[in-house]
């Protein structure tokens, strides 16, 4: 599986896998996503069929958009990346890091997939490529993730990508 990384003006904008393009949204595109998916689809020439932009998810994306705007040098750690199928340019999900790496060199990953695209290996393919890219960045030593105790699908993705469980209480914590 060849993974290509495209650089535009020195900034990574896209990670390519066998079936997917993982595209970093600009701070402006993040904002557009929260209030006008149709406009964003036109700009990116894609069709959005991933998680509905509502409720807690919308609040999270709005918060990340603010961080991305305030910290442009680190926006790739704050933005969401669209997971787009190469065959039909359909956005099936998104992936992000929740902040810049902390003082221990750790960053937390988050991800979600539209229901109709589950159980096709898209998220495993995405998490693997996304983590491979991240681990090549300066100062990053580990990627961590939090799952629900009963989140078997998410836990399988992390296990397939080499994550190991390191803590369990109300949720389960994983580290790569």
Kindly label every feature range from the protein language model:
Residues 3-108, 113-116, 129-133, 137, ...:
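GNAT-family acyltransferases
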Residues 119-124:
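Glycine-rich acyl-CoA binding loop
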Residues 145-155:
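Conserved beta-strand-loop-alpha-helix junction that forms the acyl-donor binding cleft
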Residues 158:
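Conserved active-site tyrosine of GNAT-family acetyltransferases
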């Amino acid at each position: 599986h060849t993974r290509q990384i495209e650089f535009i003006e020195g900034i990574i904008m896209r990670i390519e896998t066998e079936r997917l393009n993982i595209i970093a949204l600009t701070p402006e595109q993040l904002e557009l996503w929260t209030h006008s998916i149709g406009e964003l689809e036109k700009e990116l020439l894609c069709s959005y069929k991933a998680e509905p932009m509502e409720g807690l998810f919308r609040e999270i994306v709005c918060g990340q958009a603010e961080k991305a705007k305030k910290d442009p040098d680190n926006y790739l750690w704050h933005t969401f990346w669209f997971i787009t199928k190469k065959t039909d340019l359909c956005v099936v999900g998104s992936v992000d890091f929740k902040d810049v790496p902390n003082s221990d060199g750790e960053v937390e990953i988050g991800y979600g997939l539209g229901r109709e695209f589950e159980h096709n290996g898209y998220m495993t393919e995405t998490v693997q490529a996304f983590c491979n890219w991240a681990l090549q960045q300066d100062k990053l030593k580990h990627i961590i993730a939090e799952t629900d105790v009963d989140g078997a699908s998410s836990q399988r993705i992390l296990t397939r990508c080499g994550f190991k469980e390191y803590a369990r209480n109300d949720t389960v914590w994983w580290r790569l």
